[in-house]
């Protein structure tokens, strides 16, 4: 149930474990939860670099002429000491078959080599008992005489409430006296109403042919390339406690994976996320081989977008985001070929997009607190989901996105900064049409020169200021902005008022260029301003 491979590197500051480190291989026992029946079934998870495999236990014939057959008919000879040598649980009153819950070592059931904990009892001496109550099956087995022939089949999805052991059963207390209960072991290792107490021959067959074994068998493999994780119940804002679901690119779902401890759940959420992230990086490298140096993919991955004006029962839906070259893309499904990049739902110019950490908070839920938190002390419960960020584009268009881990939020913040700064340095400048008092002008934001305003027809420069001369600004929230510059000679503040068709895009562009300029002078400045990363590494 551990993980193999090197330990994660220490974080640069503060506590360790903030970075997602891919797991080579990882296995554990978990539960597969069925939301319709509200039952959970024991499974084994196996994580490799590229695939998450769900395994279920089954009984298989590994020798003889019945190889592969699960259904078995076995004759038990009741012994003077130990009886049938097994206990049962379940019954139709709980909508589950009666199953063998214990097999006692060296007693009748164990000697056959054909019966296993988890076997569902289908027939007793030819009588079908699939729909029988617990008490009815107990009565049949106790009063069946010295020889009892039972037909069984391994129940691959035994509800967890039956509490069947996964390993070799050990001795247990005897519940055979008094009234039997479908959720407790009814001991059949004592004598029933047999006609004799003389020693009997061992139960058959004692030969090793056929030979049966209980094994973990692969039942589902979920490819992790471009897969996504969901911790929320479908169609709601209800967080699944200590559970999550993995959905492959083709829609195949792992089902709801529930873990026995919060620490296990956290470890597996981080491990699966890390492997998905590693495969995404490989896909980015492949895509970048086909792209020019100015059109490289900087970051991409799954998020959940908050729907505008949506019904409160379902306010988020999955989206795939990408930062590539000069653009920010919003997809409904990931781009897997060069041609897919033209089918984005939305495309925005990076220089005209404002990114900010929108909402992230903690709860008392240890599932969130176990290695997932950012360390914030100011909690805000306005939104139902933590780890949200906002994207505000031109004309006031905005999106709110949510990610599953705090480390993912920090990665998106860092990647937006990097992609924007790269684009600012590549383009060097951006020019916008504007007007003032009826005159058409051009306004240029230049990485090297700062701000320039000139006449659109004559190209005559009206004024020019450096970034450092901008001391403040104000706008009407619609089209007009006032820029306050300090004259280097007079030290006086000069106000320049302009009107733009898309004021929001211009303001975001100014912000992008100034931030990139500051970062070029002081590379550590943006890290100090990063809200998510600041709390990721704080103690």
UniProtKB/Swiss-Prot annotation:
CDD domains: PDZ_syntrophin-like. Residues 73-156 form the PDZ domain. Disulfide bonds: none annotated. One of its GO terms (cellular component) is nucleoplasm. It is found in: Cell membrane, Sarcolemma; Cytoplasm, Cytoskeleton. The keyword rRNA-binding does not apply. One of its GO terms (biological process) is central nervous system development. Widely expressed. Strong expression in brain and testis. In CNS, it is expressed in the perikaryon and proximal portion of the neuronal processes. Strong expression in the hippocampus, neuron-rich dendate granule cells, and pyramidal cell layers. Highly expressed in neurons of the cerebral cortex. Also expressed in the cerebellar cortex, deep cerebellar nuclei, thalamus, and basal ganglia. Residues 296-421 form the PH domain. GO terms for molecular function: actin binding; neuroligin family protein binding; PDZ domain binding; structural molecule activity. Residues 168-209 are annotated as: Disordered. Keywords: Actin-binding, Cell membrane, Cytoplasm, Cytoskeleton, Membrane. Adapter protein that binds to and probably organizes the subcellular localization of a variety of proteins. May link various receptors to the actin cytoskeleton and the dystrophin glycoprotein complex. Interacts with the dystrophin protein DMD and related proteins DTNA and DTNB. The association with dystrophin or related proteins probably leaves the PDZ domain available to recruit proteins to the membrane. Belongs to the syntrophin family. This is Gamma-2-syntrophin. It comes from Homo sapiens. The lineage of its organism: Eukaryota, Metazoa, Chordata, Craniata, Vertebrata.
């Amino acid at each position: 149930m551990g993980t193999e491979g090197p330990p994660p590197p220490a974080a640069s500051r503060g506590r360790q474990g903030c970075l997602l480190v891919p797991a080579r291989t990882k296995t554990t026992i978990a539960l597969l939860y069925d939301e319709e029946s509200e039952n959970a079934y024991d499974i084994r998870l196996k994580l490799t670099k590229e695939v998450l495999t769900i395994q279920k236990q089954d009984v298989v014939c590994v020798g003889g002429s019945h190889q592969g057959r699960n259904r078995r008919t076995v004759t038990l000879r009741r012994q003077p000491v130990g009886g049938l040598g097994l206990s049962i649980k379940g019954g139709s009153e709980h909508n589950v078959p009666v199953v063998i819950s214990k097999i006692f070592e060296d007693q009748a059931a164990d000697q056959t080599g054909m019966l296993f904990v988890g076997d569902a009892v289908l027939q007793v001496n030819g009588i079908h008992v699939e729909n029988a109550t617990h008490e009815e099956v107990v009565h049949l087995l106790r009063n069946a005489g010295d020889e009892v022939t039972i037909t069984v089949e391994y129940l691959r999805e035994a509800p967890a409430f039956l509490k069947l052991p996964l390993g070799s059963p050990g001795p247990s207390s005897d519940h055979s006296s008094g009234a039997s209960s479908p959720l407790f072991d009814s001991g059949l290792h004592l004598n029933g109403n047999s006609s004799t107490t003389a020693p009997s021959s061992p139960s058959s067959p004692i030969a090793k042919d056929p030979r049966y074994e209980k094994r973990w068998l692969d039942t589902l493999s979920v490819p992790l390339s471009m897969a996504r994780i969901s911790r929320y119940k479908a169609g709601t804002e209800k967080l699944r406690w200590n559970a999550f679901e993995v959905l492959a690119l083709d829609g195949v779902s792992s089902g709801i994976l529930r873990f026995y401890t919060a620490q296990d759940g956290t470890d597996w959420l981080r491990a699966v996320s890390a492997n998905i992230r590693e495969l995404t990086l490989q896909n980015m490298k492949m895509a970048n081989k086909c792209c020019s140096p100015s059109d490289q993919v900087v970051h991409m991955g799954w998020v959940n977008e908050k729907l505008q004006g949506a019904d409160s029962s379902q306010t988020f839906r999955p989206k795939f985001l990408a930062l590539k070259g000069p653009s920010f893309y919003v997809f409904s499904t990931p781009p897997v070929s060069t041609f897919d990049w033209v089918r984005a739902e939305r495309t925005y110019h990076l220089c005209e997009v404002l990114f900010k950490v929108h909402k992230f908070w903690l709860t008392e839920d240890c599932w969130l607190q176990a290695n997932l938190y950012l360390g914030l002390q100011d909690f805000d419960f306005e939104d139902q989901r933590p780890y949200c960020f906002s994207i505000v584009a031109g004309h006031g268009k905005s999106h709110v996105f949510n990610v599953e881990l705090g480390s993912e939020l920090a990665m998106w913040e860092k990647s937006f900064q990097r992609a924007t700064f790269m684009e600012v340095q590549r383009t060097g400048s951006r020019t916008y049409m504007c007007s003032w008092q009826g005159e058409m002008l051009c306004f240029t934001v230049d990485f090297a020169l700062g701000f320039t305003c000139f006449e659109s027809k004559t190209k005559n420069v009206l004024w020019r200021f450096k970034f450092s001369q901008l001391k403040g600004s104000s706008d009407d929230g619609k089209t007009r902005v006032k820029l306050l510059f300090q004259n280097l000679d007079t030290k006086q503040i000069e106000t320049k008022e302009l009107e733009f068709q898309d004021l929001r895009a211009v303001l975001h562009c100014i912000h992008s260029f100034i931030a990139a300029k500051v970062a070029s002078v002081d590379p550590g400045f943006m890290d100090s301003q990063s809200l998510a990363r600041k709390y990721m590494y704080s103690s």
